[in-house]
Amino acid sequence: MTLQVIDCLGVVLAGGLSSRMGQDKAQLKRRQNATSPSAKSAHSMLDFSQQLLADAGIKNIVISGDNHQIPDRVPHAGPVGGIYSVLSHYPEHLQPKALLILPVDLPLMTASALTELRLKGELSHKATFFSDSQKNMHHIPLYLPNNAFLNMFLMQAFHREKLLANSKNNIKKNNKNGPSVRAMLEQVPHQAIASLNNQVLFNTNTPEQWQQAQQKF
């Protein structure tokens, strides 16, 4: 069987600490669903997120996070650390051409919005993310081409990977070892596209935000 390079790999980021939520955000139950006809009610946010990517036309999907398919190579390195871990999971000759990255805490996201993000990114060959009606930038969800700019940034950002991994037991859980998504985007060709619906960008980091989102399902 010959393995083929993946054109666009779907990535669910599920490795956050969920400290403000008080429980694993990936396992929160989304009891009704008005945004994705294929997903059933009472699915976890992890299941919902995977289904969104599938409904957006993504055939290959992985989950990033210590308790999931691709564990973090660098502890507590944030979303960029998850991206680095995913790309490091694939040998050089099977590197995906691009990633469509979705965090596990966007319960109002839609497959159509993700499809638009992917298509705009594929046409431009640029990292592509949403801006809302107030011109605020939302750097995730993100369509991210896997190119030389990204590879150079990740190599420089995580060249101390082994040192950090060896000191894992000495790192406080609240410390962040990875760069921000914004810092990464500054080093790669990128564009923001206007979101047609600000609601899809509503993220849930606290129980109060989760309750607000539930009222909109």
For the regions a protein language model found, what residue spans apply to each?
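Intrinsically disordered, low-complexity terminal tails and inter-domain linkers enriched
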Residues: 31-43, 92-95, 156-176
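Alpha-helical elements of Rossmann-like donor-binding domains used by nucleotide-donor carbohydrate transfer enzymes
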Residues: 48, 82-85, 116, 212
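Conserved nucleotide-sugar donor-binding
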Residues: 137-152, 207
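Conserved donor-nucleotide/metal-binding helix-loop-beta segment in metal-dependent transferases, i.e.
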Residues: 110-137
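The conserved acidic donor/metal-binding loop of glycosyltransferases
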Residues: 103-107
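Conserved alpha/beta core of the MobA/IspD/sugar-nucleotide pyrophosphorylase nucleotidyltransferase superfamily
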Residues: 3-6, 163-217
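Short phosphate-binding loop-to-helix
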Residues: 66-100
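N-terminal glycine-rich phosphate-binding loop and ensuing alpha1 helix
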Residues: 2-66
